[in-house]
């Protein structure tokens, strides 16, 4: 159990049997009375959000979450198949739990899969992925008047802004947290 004073942004708690993550946290000390802790909580199963205020001394349950390294194998038409990197067990994750990372998810990528009561509830990509460019406008040397970046499509279908010298077939490194171009991967 967490005391209200231990709550912080990003902390995962359990309320009424569901896991929540604290999206925003604010400490409020009124002129008179107990300190208050205002939290914006997001249900990790449904995605719904709500605000809740705790008083000092209130207790909140810890979410029983487990994170495992798993490799994304394939999409079977309905679910995404992941394999545990230590036990080699395979699980199927519904599209709703993969939606946030789908545009950068490539086969054979090792991800962190979050489990609640032995059920996969979320997938986190590594901080950086390397993907090949499949579509890009051609670059004309000396063409700097049109701006510093151009849109390209990578092999997963995601559209990104990259420097104009990047061409089709090249592999680029992408920061998955911001979906920004980092660098061209040297062969």
Swiss-Prot record:
Highest taxon listed in the record's lineage: Bacteria
Cell location: Cytoplasm
Main subcellular location of this protein, as a coarse class: cytoplasm
The entry's keywords: Cytoplasm, Elongation factor, Protein biosynthesis
Pathway: Protein biosynthesis; polypeptide chain elongation
GO cellular component: cytoplasm
GO molecular function, one term: translation elongation factor activity
InterPro entries membership: Elong-fact-P_C, NA-bd_OB-fold, Rib_uL2_dom2, Transl_elong_fac_P/YeiP, Transl_elong_KOW-like, Transl_elong_P/YeiP_cen, Transl_elong_P/YeiP_CS, Transl_elongation_fac_P
One Pfam assignment: EFP
GO biological process terms on file: peptide biosynthetic process
Stated family: Belongs to the elongation factor P family.
Its biological purpose: Involved in peptide bond synthesis. Stimulates efficient translation and peptide-bond synthesis on native or reconstituted 70S ribosomes in vitro. Probably functions indirectly by altering the affinity of the ribosome for aminoacyl-tRNA, thus increasing their reactivity as acceptors for peptidyl transferase.
PANTHER family noted in UniProt: ELONGATION FACTOR P, ELONGATION FACTOR P (EF-P) FAMILY PROTEIN
The protein's name: Elongation factor P
Organism from which the protein derives: Desulfosudis oleivorans (strain DSM 6200 / JCM 39069 / Hxd3) (Desulfococcus oleovorans)
Species classification: Bacteria, Pseudomonadati, Thermodesulfobacteriota, Desulfobacteria, Desulfobacterales
